[in-house]
């Protein structure tokens, strides 16, 4: 077994800020995880290490997980983490910071409670603690959320700006504050995600068709973007994901 990973919708009040919660346990041989950018940010508890905020990434992150290590997380969709955590998302871009630097002593206390809790109850404990902390937190930027959805569906940045009645410049500024980077970068990230979803449907992926349907100009365009964002060419990335 390489790892055991499970993901579920954010429960109760937490769902107004977060998109999901997740739990992972590395297998007996450990695991090198290639985490791809997705526009999201996570509050993550790692057994033996404490709690961190993993900010929105613009490239792949390789995480070496020792054998048997448990990790839990609360994931915030594009544009949600900054408002919920009370920090500018631009300050979290491509960074992992201790939650204590954001929340102070309550983060340390929560980490201690998680370390001492029964494994089966840890995810619920983390979700409940984050939900309490976010009670009354600022809502995410609704225009950024709407524009993110349009970009995820394949709309061009300029067209998305018009749809939300903002200039390209104003949309970029709001994206940097809320998402951590501009709409063009999020568009690239979400396009790669669309390609992977298309290519991983069915037993024999048609890379050319998946690339075209995802919105790439041609296969060289896909290859460049895949190498830049994921660190591997398309076929190698798909093979690595299939073996994980």
Predicted regions and their residues:
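DNA major-groove recognition helix of helix-turn-helix
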Residues: 175, 187, 225-227, 238
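Alpha-helical bundle regulatory/interaction domains
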Residues: 1-168, 178-183, 197-202, 206-217, ...
């Amino acid at each position: 077994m390489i790892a055991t990973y499970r993901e579920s919708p954010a429960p109760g009040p937490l769902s107004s800020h977060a998109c999901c919660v997740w739990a992972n346990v590395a297998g007996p041989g450990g695991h090198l995880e290639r985490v791809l950018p997705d526009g999201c940010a996570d509050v993550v508890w790692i057994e033996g290490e404490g709690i961190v905020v993993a900010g929105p990434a613009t490239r792949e992150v390789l995480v070496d997980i020792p054998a048997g290590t448990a990790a839990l997380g609360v994931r915030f969709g594009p544009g949600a983490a900054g408002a919920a955590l009370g920090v500018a998302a631009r300050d979290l871009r491509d960074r992992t910071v201790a939650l204590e630097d954001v929340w102070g002593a309550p983060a340390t206390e929560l980490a201690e409670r998680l370390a001492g809790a029964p494994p089966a109850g840890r995810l619920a404990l983390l979700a409940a603690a984050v939900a309490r902390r976010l009670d009354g937190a600022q809502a995410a930027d609704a225009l950024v959320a709407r524009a993110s959805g349009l970009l995820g569906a394949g709309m061009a940045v300029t067209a998305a700006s018009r749809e939300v009645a903002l200039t390209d410049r104003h949309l970029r500024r709001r994206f940097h504050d809320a998402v951590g980077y501009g709409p063009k970068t999020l568009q690239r990230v979400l396009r790669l995600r669309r390609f992977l979803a298309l290519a991983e449907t069915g037993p024999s992926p048609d890379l050319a068709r998946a690339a075209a349907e995802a919105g790439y100009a041609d296969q060289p365009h896909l290859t460049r973007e895949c190498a830049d964002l994921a660190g591997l060419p398309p076929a190698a990335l798909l093979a690595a994901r299939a073996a994980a």
